[in-house]
């Protein structure tokens, strides 16, 4: 039996391994783990053995028959070649002589060893002692294989792999237990320099709408790329890069591509995660090679998508590798604009024809100054501060949530579909607050699907109740559908159907119900359709809101003509619950066309230290990115309660953060604040000073005239619900039961009276009931109680004396 005796514990193992090998003639090397798996599948008694222990036995059996896995032989050959470079030829010859003297039967193997050790039978000559010394060095090299791998990252150069053609007669089928042994391909080190190459961008500024202000800022930052000589006269280093941030889907990557396309400069683009590797030191090497590639192709623009994935804050990084990657990015950015290495003076001297001598030096901005790095991220606060300092990503360009005008411009760029005559882009822009470019693109795509379904149902499925068809009817409809699909593709056949295949306004309305805008994905609410016409009464409060928020946006020129500061103001709406404070805030945002962020007080509270403050910063940052914007804090008393002396709890920290954001060093710019509360007496006094919440408006209980207006607006002038001919709003408003009713109570009154009218029509089979009558309102008024008790009404009357609007006293004559 070749290789020695069998296994005492399992004499049949070695013959079975040999039998398995004979199944694959021509195969030279086998993997022990694959052979062990095949044997366990063939022989049930091996399935009960531990796979790791059994694999060791199979490995020993393969070693006995001198068939070691190719990976192990490759390692030995690699080690031998490495040592050949440093050892003398006589020592290697002595080792070969010594190996020839050693018999093959003298190999001693173990279950853990990957290669057998040889037994020395010759005398100890000088050459043999040198050979043994060489073996010790090889063993030492084995134990230090991890360090050798890292060393190769910095010493070996990646060479393009050359495909080798294999003759057909030499191609053999790979058995399950055979080693594939593919040629070693270069890993991620060479991937950046070999596969990432500059390319042209076909996106230009004209393809992006609503970002003219940002484009103007980019042109100032990229001046050195198009006019390097002009910029060099300033004698300052050019900008190395900037960060583009905004909510997901706002067009950050497309914006960066448009910069390269408009300036006609090649770009290098890749996701930041493509640089991440599991081998220590490889990620840093990829970054270095990427920046070297950018320098070699200067001028160019380097785009790193989602840069926060590889550049998190170092103080919160969980692994040391993340800190090293951030440090490497900082170093690579610094090296973009560095003076070149000093050359010998003789290489810098030039002699003219007239005998003059001049010193020619390279421009310090010649190598990497033509590289502009653009990083995109949805979380700028998550990027390490070292990258955001001056000299690196010192500029940040915000692409916030577009306003109504910007949305209309975006729709003009992306809407290439066939629209019906009743559709205008201005209408769609007004119905899509909180939508970014990707959301608008999805809306158009969804509206097209709705139009296709509508036309399809009209042409093919004539029956409107096709969802309740029987099995035979479904089969018949399916045959009709297939016949239409397999017919001639003639679009003119649809011209008779409502003017052809067009997207109507109704299609957009149906599509709006299925698309979730970016503002809602971020946790912020939007206001689609609340206007002053939907709000009854509250005339004085509406006037104050218009002068504080509406006119500074719509009549900014008049403010400037009189020299009035147009700074954003804050309003605190207080009063009993249900009087329309939230509706007022929504209507203000809708009338101005501004973005609207609704924040309920408890939503920002978090049990973890620092998370509540971070949520406040996020809200204000989103508002600044989407300015002009209105932030509405509902139940603001839960956010900013009064602080006691010396308090240092989480609530106090949250109040401090909110105070800083409201009136900090940076300012709010065009961010308006509206707060609503039922308890202004427990709100911290620092919030109520001018500059934060400038005015306090008390929203009182509606009077009789106010109740008439609320009833008329809530019923859409008697159309929703349908009202009877005997309805008199003044009579209803004067009912004694309605004393102390709020606007929400009146809405509940209308709903209850509608249900009573429906019950009379359905349960009593009284088809003469065509709408809600006076008797239904009277019965509903007797059932509903006011939401604010008498004791609470007295408290709000006292609050009105403190915070209510003071009436101007007439001048004395």
Curated annotation (Swiss-Prot):
Keywords: Apoptosis, ATP-binding, Coiled coil, Nucleotide-binding
Cross-referenced CDD domains: RecA-like_NVL_r2-like
Span list, region Disordered: 97-131, 152-193
GO MF term list: ATP binding; ATP hydrolysis activity; preribosome binding
Entry's Gene Ontology BP terms: apoptotic process; lipid storage; negative regulation of apoptotic process; negative regulation of execution phase of apoptosis; positive regulation of nematode larval development; ribosome biogenesis
Bias type Polar residues, positions: 158-172
SMART domains: AAA
Nucleotide-binding found in the keyword field: yes
Keyword Lyase: no
Binding residue positions for ATP: 246-253, 575-582
Source domain of life: Eukaryota
PROSITE patterns: AAA
Composition bias type Low complexity, residue spans: 175-191
Consequences of knocking out this gene: RNAi-mediated knockdown causes an arrest at the L2-L3 larval stages with few adults reaching adulthood. Abnormal presence of vacuoles in the intestine with some intestinal sections almost completely degraded. RNAi-mediated knockdown in a ced-3 (n718) or ced-4 (n1416) mutant background causes a similar arrest at the L2-L3 larval stages.
Entry's Gene Ontology cellular component terms: caspase complex; nucleus
Recorded coiled-coil stretches: 58-89, 122-152
Family listed: Belongs to the AAA ATPase family.
Complex formation: Found in a complex composed of ced-3, ced-4 and mac-1 or of ced-9, ced-4 and mac-1. Within the complex, interacts with ced-4.
Function statement: Probably together with ced-9, plays a modest role in preventing ced-4 and caspase ced-3-mediated apoptosis.
Protein name, as recorded: Protein mac-1
Organism: Caenorhabditis elegans
Gene name of this polypeptide: mac-1
């Amino acid at each position: 039996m070749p290789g020695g005796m069998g296994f005492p514990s399992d004499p049949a193992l070695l013959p079975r391994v040999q039998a398995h090998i004979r199944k694959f003639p021509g195969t030279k090397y086998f993997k022990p783990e694959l052979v062990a798996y095949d044997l366990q599948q063939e022989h049930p008694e091996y399935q009960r053995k531990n796979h790791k222990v059994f694999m060791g036995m199979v490995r020993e059996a393969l070693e006995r028959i001198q068939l070691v896995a190719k990976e192990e032989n490759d390692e030995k050959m690699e080690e031998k070649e490495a040592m050949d470079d440093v050892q003398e030829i006589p020592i290697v010859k002595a080792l070969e002589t010594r190996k020839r003297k050693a018999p093959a039967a003298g190999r001693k193997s173990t279950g853990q060893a990957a290669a057998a050790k040889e037994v020395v039978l010759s005398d100890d000559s000088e050459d043999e002692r040198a050979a043994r010394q060489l073996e010790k060095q090889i063993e030492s090299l084995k134990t230090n294989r991890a360090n050798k791998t890292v060393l190769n990252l910095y010493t070996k150069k990646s060479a393009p792999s050359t495909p080798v053609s294999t003759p057909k007669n030499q191609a053999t089928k790979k058995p399950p237990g055979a080693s594939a042994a593919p040629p070693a391909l270069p890993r991620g080190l060479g991937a950046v320099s070999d596969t990432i190459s500059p390319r042209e961008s076909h996106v230009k500024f004209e393809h992006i709408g609503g970002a003219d202000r940002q484009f103007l800022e980019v042109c100032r930052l990229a001046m050195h790329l198009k006019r390097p000589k002009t910029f060099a006269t300033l004698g300052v280093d050019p900008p190395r890069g900037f960060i583009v941030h905004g909510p997901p889907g706002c067009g950050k990557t497309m914006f960066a591509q448009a910069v390269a396309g408009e300036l006609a400069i090649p770009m290098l683009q890749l996701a930041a995660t493509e640089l991440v590797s599991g081998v220590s030191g490889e990620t840093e090497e990829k970054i270095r090679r990427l920046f070297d590639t950018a320098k070699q192709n200067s001028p160019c623009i380097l785009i790193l998508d989602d840069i926060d994935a590889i550049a998190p804050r170092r103080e919160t990084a969980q692994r040391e590798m993340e800190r090293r990657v951030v440090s490497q990015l900082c170093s690579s950015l610094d090296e973009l604009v560095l003076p070149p290495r000093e050359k010998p003076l003789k290489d810098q001297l030039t002699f003219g024809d007239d005998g003059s001598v001049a010193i020619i030096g390279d421009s310090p901005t010649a190598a990497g100054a033509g590289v502009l790095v653009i990083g995109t991220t949805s979380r700028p606060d998550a990027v390490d501060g070292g990258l955001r300092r001056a000299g690196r990503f010192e500029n940040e360009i915000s692409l916030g949530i577009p306003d109504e005008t910007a949305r209309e411009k975006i729709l003009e760029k992306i809407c290439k579909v066939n629209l019906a005559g009743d559709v205008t882009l201005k209408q769609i822009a007004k119905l899509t607050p909180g939508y970014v470019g990707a959301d608008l693109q999805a809306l158009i795509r969804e509206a097209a699907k709705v139009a296709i379904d509508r036309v399809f149902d009209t042409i093919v499925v004539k029956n409107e109740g096709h969802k309740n068809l029987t099995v035979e009817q479904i089969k018949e409809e399916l045959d009709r559908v297939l016949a239409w699909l397999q017919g001639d593709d003639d679009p003119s056949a649809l011209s008779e159907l409502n003017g052809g295949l067009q997207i109507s306004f109704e299609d957009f309305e149906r599509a709006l119900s299925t698309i979730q805008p970016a503002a809602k994905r971020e946790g912020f609410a939007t206001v689609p359709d609340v206007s002053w016409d939907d709000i009854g009464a509250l005339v004085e409060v509406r006037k104050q809101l218009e002068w504080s928020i509406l006119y500074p946006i719509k009549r900014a020129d008049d403010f400037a003509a009189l020299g009035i500061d147009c700074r954003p103001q804050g309003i605190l709406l207080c009063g009993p619950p249900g009087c329309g404070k939230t509706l007022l805030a929504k209507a203000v945002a809708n009338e101005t066309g501004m973005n609207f962020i609704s924040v309920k007080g408890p939503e920002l509270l978090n049990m973890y230290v620092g998370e509540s403050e971070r949520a406040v910063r996020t809200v204000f940052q989103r508002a600044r990115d989407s300015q002009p914007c209105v932030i509405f804090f509902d139940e603001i008393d839960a956010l900013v309660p009064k602080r006691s002396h010396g308090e240092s709890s989480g609530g106090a920290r949250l109040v401090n953060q909110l105070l800083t954001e409201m009136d900090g060093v940076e300012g709010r710019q065009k961010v308006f604040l509206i707060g609503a509360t039922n308890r202004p007496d427990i709100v911290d006094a620092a919030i109520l000073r001018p500059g934060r919440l400038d005015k306090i408006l008390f929203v009182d209980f509606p009077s009789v005239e106010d109740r008439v207006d609320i009833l008329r607006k809530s019923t859409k002038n008697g159309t929703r619900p349908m009202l009877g001919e005997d309805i008199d709003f003044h009579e209803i408003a004067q009912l004694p039961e309605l004393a102390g009713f709020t606007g929400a109570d009146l809405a509940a009154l209308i709903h209850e009276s509608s249900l009573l009218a429906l019950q009379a029509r359905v349960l009593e089979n009284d088809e003469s009931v065509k709408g809600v009558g006076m008797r239904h309102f009277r019965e509903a008024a007797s059932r509903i109680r006011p939401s604010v008790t008498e004791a609470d009404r007295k408290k709000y009357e006292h609050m009105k004396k403190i915070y209510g609007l003071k009436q101007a006293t007439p001048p004395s004559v």
